[in-house]
Amino acid sequence: MIRLTEVAKEYPRSGVALSHVSFQVRKGEFVFLTGPSGSGKTTILKLLYMDDRPTKGEVWINGVSSNTASGRDITLLRRRIGIVFQDFRLLEDRSAEANVRFALEVTGAPKANIRPKVARVLTQVGLASKALNFPRELSGGEQQRVAIARALVNDPFVLIADEPTGNLDERATRSVFQLLRDINAAGTAVIMATHDLDLVRRSNYRTIELNHGRIVFDSAESPASARPFDEPFDVEITPTSRETL
């Protein structure tokens, strides 16, 4: 379903972001991307939803190649990919329901299908009773649930999550992570970048660790005892406050 082959990414100012990165993600798999800030996690995620293209190598996702994809190919591909960010990226002047509905409207979804789809995903994330609330009326955990609902409404085959619990307290983190686990159990692949090593250690999901743009560990190929991340990573805290669920 997803394959990276000898992928490298270089930027004119910052230099090498990725080097010789190769791995595959199977249908329905849950994969953690870990590593210190600047190790290449977010760069990989951007390549997966083709916000950027590799300098060398190739990214294959759902039959689309980064080397040959047209703009239309990428547009259609993104409709099948759910993306969740650390800072939620909600429209502040729209309700939870309207934020989710917008993701369908921009794809030209039939109007008759929009309301039931939105209701379904808001129920799935546990926010049916707060559909008309605006982001400012929701906690951080609830805002992230709205963002997840928005990512799910187009029935993606993979959910890409970039530090989805990074701005949440422990209680909200557990709740959001359990939601991601439930989504994965229902058949959607999840690729999650995180600094939260406690979360990783408590899970049995595949873990790929990056450092200086290279893969230094992949639990699919190495025993768990070989994991190199014994010490906490340096974490960048964004200005968004940590809120409870």
Please state what every model-predicted region is.
Residues 134-138, 142-144:
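Conserved ABC ATPase signature
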Residues 66-82, 185, 227-228:
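ABC ATPase NBD coupling module
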Residues 94-102:
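Short coil-to-helix segment of the ABC ATPase nucleotide-binding domain corresponding to the Q-loop/switch region
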Residues 57-66:
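Conserved ABC transporter NBD signature motif
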Residues 49:
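Helix-to-loop junction immediately C-terminal to a conserved catalytic motif
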Residues 159-162:
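Catalytic Walker B motif of ABC-type/P-loop ATPase nucleotide-binding domains
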Residues 153-157:
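A short, proline-enriched helix->beta-strand linker immediately N-terminal to the Walker B motif
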